[in-house]
């Protein structure tokens, strides 16, 4: 059991290291607000007009302290945008904390977010526990998958956003917290409100600065720059010099990428591991040139969940 735990910890650290390096690669983008200058300085990563415009909006919003709501399908890069907002803000030298609202058990999420006072329950820390909201004080709290937050926690979060005060579980003393909120979802929250699954008042509290990130299929000009960047990254990681053939690149361009950037990254990583030659050919790429349908239909706006992640 000990050896298994050590192995799992090592694998987690490796994955975190890779993600950190990729995020840093993504964030080698211009801080300029002017679209022409932004295009000139970032030709290697995003060349589509949609993303050049989006990054201009991100740069403007980042300078404020406004609450931000990121909308987009699974895998479009909402995490990267959230971190960029933090990196360009006045809070950049403070803490950035990401909370995956969909992965924390419902019976634990209250204490995870708000913390608890000493002696609140049997087995609790004698000194109490600081919550993630409090831990992010002065910095940015990224609430990923906000649409998965249970209704009781939506109420508590709304109260916090109204007063910017928290009260640890088991405590009677409120505490003022200065933190910027960035939330993200791949769900259509207006549809969720109509179904009684999301509070309308919380939605309007979050809907201050809204950034809608287009899917990869709608910005074809970004596919090859991203694919080449991932290939350079994973080629370097695995000590290989790799390149795509023209036919392979054509195949990548023709595919519709229902899993967006994450699907592209995972595919390229797999190719970097399994390719027998330095040139990756179309026959090596495990996708069809014909567009594959997304896992769920477009009937519900932004509700395109493939695996519940963003």
Set out the residue ranges of the language-model regions:
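Sensory-domain boundary capping and coupling elements
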Residues: 1-3
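AAA+/SF3 P-loop NTPase mechanochemical coupling elements
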Residues: 127-138, 142, 150-156, 167-186, ...
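Nucleotide-binding/hydrolysis machinery
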Residues: 91-94, 170-180, 187-294
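Bacterial C-terminal helix-turn-helix
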Residues: 298-310
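Conserved post-Walker A coupling segment in P-loop NTPases
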Residues: 57-123, 134-150, 215-220, 267
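Flexible nucleotide-interacting loop at or near the entrance of a catalytic core
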Residues: 7-67, 71
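Catalytic acidic motif of RecA-like/P-loop NTPases
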Residues: 7, 147-148, 158
């Amino acid at each position: 059991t000990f050896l298994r735990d050590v192995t799992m910890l090592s694998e987690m650290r490796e994955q975190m290291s890779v993600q950190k390096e990729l995020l840093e690669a993504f964030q080698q983008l211009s801080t300029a607000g002017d679209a022409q200058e932004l295009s000139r300085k970032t030709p290697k990563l995003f060349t589509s007009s949609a993303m050049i415009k989006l990054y201009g909006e991100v740069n403007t919003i980042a300078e404020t302290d406004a609450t931000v709501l990121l909308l987009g399908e699974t895998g479009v890069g909402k995490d990267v945008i959230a971190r960029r907002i933090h990196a360009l803000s006045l809070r950049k030298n403070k803490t950035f904390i990401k909370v995956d609202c969909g992965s924390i058990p419902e019976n634990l999420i209250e204490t995870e977010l708000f913390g608890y006072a000493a002696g609140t329950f049997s087995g609790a820390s004698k000194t109490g526990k600081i919550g993630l909201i409090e831990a992010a004080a002065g910095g940015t709290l990224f609430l990923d998958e906000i649409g998965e937050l249970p209704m009781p926690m939506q109420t508590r979060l709304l109260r916090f956003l109204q007063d910017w005060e928290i009260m640890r579980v088991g405590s009677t003393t409120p505490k003022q917290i200065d933190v910027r909120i960035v939330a993200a979802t791949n769900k259509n929250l207006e549809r969720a409100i109509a179904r009684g699954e999301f509070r309308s008042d919380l939605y309007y509290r979050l809907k201050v600065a809204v950034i809608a990130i287009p899917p990869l299929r709608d910005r074809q000009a970004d596919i090859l720059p991203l694919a080449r960047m991932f290939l350079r990254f994973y080629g370097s990681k695995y000590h290989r010099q790799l390149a795509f053939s023209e036919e392979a690149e054509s195949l990548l361009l023709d595919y519709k990428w229902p899993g967006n950037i994450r699907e592209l990254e995972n595919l390229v990583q797999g190719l970097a591991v399994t390719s027998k030659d330095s040139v990756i050919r179309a026959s090596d790429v495990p996708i069809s040139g014909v567009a594959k349908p997304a896992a769920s239909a477009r009937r519900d706006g932004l509700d395109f969940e493939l695996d519940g992640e963003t």
